[in-house]
UniProtKB/Swiss-Prot annotation:
Its cofactor is Fe(2+). Fe cation binds at residues 224, 272, 338, 528. Homodimer. The keyword Iron applies. Coiled coil: none annotated. It comes from Phaseolus vulgaris. Binds 1 Fe(2+) ion per subunit. Belongs to the carotenoid oxygenase family. GO terms for cellular component: chloroplast stroma. Cleaves a variety of carotenoids at the 9-10 and 9'-10' double bonds. Probably not involved in abscisic acid biosynthesis. Keywords: Dioxygenase, Iron, Metal-binding, Oxidoreductase. GO terms for molecular function: carotenoid dioxygenase activity; metal ion binding. GO terms for biological process: carotene catabolic process. This is Carotenoid 9,10(9',10')-cleavage dioxygenase 1.
Length: 543
């Protein structure tokens, strides 16, 4: 990439987020109306499970250096391990869903065996406006149930129509995931555009602005774009409640976003993830459908799952200019939050994914029980034959597995190992599991344990819970063994009330961690993690 590409990509497309909310008479009248609705229609006795314990929010922490390290931090971990998650700055007016919290990034800067911890809010338009008012103002997923939900939607529409809230920079939380592309760390949530984050030498994090790719991005942007490690391109999509329900995008290694490719499907769905191979993009038309009428009628969330519909998978040549050559495949009804990887094998496209039989987003609402008896997320292999048009699937694990990660040097190419989290609820990670896709699963096992295709299981132990683990190779590229590296994750000890970062040997999955870093503050449970290498940190520092 020449200097011109760097210059244009760095300056073009980064928008300073400067919303203009108004706090006049209209604002006060709507606040009063909202207060009355909450008083008469909301059951305030309902507990906010996802605001208690280690789900509860924390304040920002500036860089805190020279943390206690038990063991050693290998040189390949020089860089910054970051994880984002929901952390509401202001108390909710009524309901609260785990997905509602403001995005906060927790970072561990590692350099020459030493560790520094930092946590910073992503300075979104939404957060800036609520800071201006000093209270919660934006609509929450946790409110979107029944008649009360419909009325709260109208309150939100009134606030935007009367310019109490300014949606010209979107209204997302940016609390879901992180990716690095074209010299920028991007913080993501699927209801908004990406926010660019600068990582400083001391580990500190600063929100630079919103990325709109020189006004070429006019729709939402998935929290799970895919970066091809061989070409440097990034592949993405957005979903919407109005047609086109899915829009596919390709971004060059130089940061140029190509023209949109609309994908035609029958219903407005939630599509949280997708996949790429060397030549294809894989879309998932799964029946978690946006149905506001059912929200009012059945007192459910605004997305409802239709168990009568098949799961559809669309395979599109990844550089297609339109959807003309997309091939659709059907499999039994399911939902998928997260894919591990995909690749091509002879006439087939292979997808490794975490398949969920019964998605109930209510389970991550405010009143959920601690354990989820029916949350059965299992590792699956799905195959789509491009020659015959047939689809098949094979179960690879018992329940419950999520947040699958691979050595990302193999993104879109055949790989052997998958690392996932074991869960005792939708949010409580009890350990890290390693699958060997070359081995056959042991279907006699009803729970996740070593044997068959389960090559290792790192159990966090009683009262200790984690979040997504990121694989970091010891050597860049694919010349060394695929599992020659480390897994890094945040861990919270509920008994001691302390948080840590664990570093695990990804090859041996030894119960003895390579390193444990004690953190100065509690780190709440969150969503997706990422590792910014030392090379990337130095590259983005030039912007």
């Amino acid at each position: 990439m020449g200097d011109d590409g760097k210059k244009n990509g760095a300056e073009g497309g980064l928008v300073k987020v400067d919303p203009k909310p108004t706090n006049g008479f209209s604002s006060k009248v709507i606040d009063l109306l909202e207060k009355l609705l909450v008083k008469f229609l909301y059951d305030s006795s309902l507990p906010h499970h996802y605001l208690t314990g280690n789900f509860g929010p924390v304040t920002e922490t500036p860089p805190t250096k020279d943390l206690p390290v038990k063991g050693h931090l290998p040189d390949c971990l020089n860089g910054e391990f970051v994880r984002v998650g929901p952390n509401p700055k202001f108390a909710p007016v009524a309901g609260y869903h785990w997905f509602d919290g403001d995005g906060m990034i927790h970072g561990l800067r590692i350099k020459d065996g030493k560790a520094t911890y930092v946590s910073r809010f992503v300075e979104t338009s939404r957060l800036k406006q609520e800071e201006y008012f000093g209270r919660s103002k934006f609509m929450k997923i946790g409110d979107l149930k029944g008649l009360f939900g419909l009325l709260m939607v109208n309150i939100h529409m009134l606030r935007t129509k009367l310019k109490v809230l300014d949606l010209s920079y979107g209204g997302g939380t940016t609390n879901t995931a992180l990716v690095y592309h074209h010299g920028k760390l991007l913080a993501l949530s699927e209801a908004d555009k990406p926010y660019a984050i600068k990582v400083f030498e001391d580990g500190d994090l600063q929100t630079l602005g919103m990325l709109d790719y020189d006004k070429r991005l006019g729709h939402s942007f998935t929290a799970h774009p895919k970066v091809d490690p061989f070409t440097g391109e990034m592949f993405s999509f957005g979903y919407a409640h109005t047609p086109p329900y899915i829009t596919y995008r390709v971004i060059s290694k130089d940061g140029y976003m190509h023209d949109p490719v609309p994908i035609t499907i029958s219903d407005p769905i939630m599509m949280h993830d997708f996949a790429i191979t060397e030549n294809y993009a894989v879309f998932m038309d799964l029946p978690l459908i946006f149905r506001p009428k059912e929200m009012v009628k059945n007192k459910t969330l605004i997305f409802s799952f239709d168990s009568t519909k098949k799961a559809r998978f669309g395979v599109l040549p990844r550089y297609a200019k339109d959807e003309q050559h997309i091939r659709w495949f059907e499999l039994p009804n399911c939902f998928i939050f997260h894919n591990a990887n995909a690749w091509e094998e002879e006439d087939e496209v292979v997808l490794i994914t975490c398949r969920l039989q019964n998605p109930k987003l209510d389970n991550v609402g405010g009143t959920v029980q601690e354990k989820l008896e029916n949350f059965s997320n299992e590792l699956y292999e799905m195959r789509f034959n491009m020659k015959t048009g047939e689809a098949s699937q094979k179960k690879l694990s018992a329940s419950t597995v999520d947040f699958p990660r691979v050595n990302e040097n193999y993104t879109g190419r055949k790989q052997r190992y998958v690392y996932g989290t074991t869960l005792d609820s939708i949010a409580k990670v009890t350990g890290i599991i390693k699958f060997d896709l070359h081995a056959e699963p042991d279907h006699g096992k009803e729970k996740l344990e070593v044997g068959g295709n389960v090559q290792g299981l790192y159990d966090l132990g009683p009262g200790k819970f984690g979040s997504e683990a990121v694989y970091i190779p010891r050597v860049p590229g694919i010349e060394s063994e695929e599992d020659d590296g480390y897994l890094v994750l945040f861990v919270h000890d509920e008994n001691a009330g302390k948080s840590f970062v664990h570093v695990i040997d990804a090859k041996t999955m030894s119960a003895d961690p390579v390193a444990v870093v004690e953190l100065p503050n509690r780190v709440p449970y969150g969503f997706h993690a990422f590792f910014v290498t030392e090379e990337q940190l130095q590259e983005q520092a030039k912007l």
